[in-house]
Each structure stands twice: as structure tokens, then as C-alpha cells.
């Protein structure tokens, strides 16, 4: 996405989380027709509803279309007459786009950590449960970042790691 040769006329973003909304805003500011698709009825659920409502209002005014409560069924690249992507939704709607960004979430990368040897269990998305100090159910094991889930952002993960390390070594934060 950072190395596209030219700007698209139509841009579809699958996923209305932080990354999806950020890129949708940037491309809309460039005058590009943007559609955001998300299976949830409300994007950015962790933010105050009034803030999200205002953000959506501003984004709609900038030309962004939201297809909330929709699930992508299929993506099809069509080569002729010009290369584009057809995004088919489970509702039967079809979106035609020049560029698609898939930013519909992360899963914890825990498959190869041999967690069974530790007694730790993950949820259905591979995430570990932690307390306020990032301590797992095994008292001497801490976890941070994508393996604990929300929000899966690099800066947040770095801060979680710092706090977990401080807790592990008994350092006040």
C-alpha cells in the first residue's frame, strides 16, 4: 500500500478498526471514493460513542461510504477492460474498487509457543488473558502485544511490554 504506483479512483477498506479508519480518512482526504466494510455495526467500539458518531459524520461528509453489519464473501480480481477488484458482500451487494485494503483484525501469534507445556490456554483467536500487570494465569509468565489482543497497535504493544517488564521485576511505574 505504501508503494502503489498511482492513486486509485475507488478504494475499499475491509475492517473499521484503527488502521482501516485511518487509511480511509487519508485516502478520502485525497479525493478518492472510499468505502469501508465491517461486520460490526459500529466501528472503533472502544471509543466513546459520541466521538465515533462525530468521526463518522465528518468522514461521510468527506465522501466515505460505510457498509456496517456487512461481511465480505469474496474478492475477485478482474483484468479487463481495466484491472479492478469486485468485492462481493454476503448481502448480495457488489463493490467495484481499484484497490482493497484488508485490515479486519489480528490474531495472537501463539500457535508455535508450546503453551501446553506452561498450562496456559488461549481463546478462539489465539489470545492470552492477562491482569492489569500483564500477568497471565501462570504467575511468572507475562504477556503483551498481539498475543493479548486489543488494541493491536505497535505503540500500545511497546507500552504493554514496558509495563509487563516493570511488573515482572517489581519496578514501580
Description of each model-found segment:
Residues 17-20, 48, 52, 154-157:
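Short, conserved glycine- and acidic-residue-centered signature motifs
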Residues 1-8, 94-172:
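FAD-site-proximal beta/loop scaffold in flavoenzymes
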Residues 5-39, 44-47:
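Rossmann-like NAD(P)H-binding beta-loop-alpha module
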Residues 30-132:
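A Rossmann-like FAD-binding core segment of flavoenzymes
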Amino acid at each position: 500500500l505504501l508503494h502503489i504506483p498511482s492513486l486509485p479512483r475507488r478504494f475499499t477498506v475491509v475492517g473499521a478498526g484503527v488502521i482501516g479508519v485511518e487509511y480511509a480518512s487519508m485516502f478520502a482526504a485525497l479525493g478518492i471514493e472510499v468505502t469501508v466494510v465491517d461486520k460490526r455495526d459500529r466501528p472503533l467500539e472502544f471509543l466513546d460513542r459520541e466521538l465515533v458518531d462525530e468521526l463518522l459524520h465528518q468522514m461521510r461528509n468527506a465522501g466515505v461510504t460505510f457498509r456496517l453489519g456487512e461481511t465480505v464473501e469474496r474478492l475477485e480480481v478482474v483484468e479487463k477492460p481495466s484491472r479492478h477488484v469486485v468485492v462481493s458482500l454476503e448481502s448480495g451487494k457488489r463493490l467495484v474498487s481499484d484497490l482493497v485494503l484488508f485490515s479486519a483484525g489480528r490474531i495472537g501469534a501463539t500457535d508455535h509457543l508450546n503453551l501446553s507445556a506452561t498450562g496456559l490456554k488461549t481463546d478462539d483467536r489465539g489470545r492470552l488473558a492477562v491482569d492489569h500487570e500483564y500477568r497471565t494465569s501462570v504467575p511468572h509468565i507475562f504477556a503483551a502485544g498481539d498475543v493479548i489482543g486489543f488494541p493491536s497497535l505497535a505503540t500500545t504493544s511497546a507500552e504493554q511490554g514496558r509495563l509487563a517488564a516493570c511488573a515482572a521485576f517489581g519496578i514501580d511505574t
